[in-house]
Amino acid sequence: MQVAGIDLAWGSRARTGVALTDEHGALLRSASVTTDEQIADFLSGNSPAVIAIDAPIIVTNASGMRECERDLSRDFRRFHAGTHPTNVSRPSMQPEPRAKRLVQAHGWGTDVELSPGPMSPVALEVYPHSSMVGLFGLDRVI
């Protein structure tokens, strides 16, 4: 089972990091890209079961933070690993989040109840800073 990671820039001018690992977590390849087409080219010929995206996928709140951002910030702010507020009034979320457009374009699911696989890949929104704090027992984000 391959896993793809996308450190998605919120706009298409900034650099986006992409990586692909095998079922054991070994890095198969990585790249720095800018456009959604380059992301598609990077993933072409591969079948990741899970796509971990460091960017908002589902944003429905008009202002402020999403509930998940509030919860995560409450728990990880003291480690300097809180989140930035995401809402539909932000220009970068118009007409919809870039990550959502990618998910829709590639036909990735977002329902965590599904069993991911090469034929039914699932995209997940991830927070690397808080993950590093939790996984490595850090006192502060790196």
Model-predicted regions and their roles:
Residues 1-4, 8-142:
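RNase H-like (RuvC/DEDD) metal-dependent nuclease/polynucleotide-processing core
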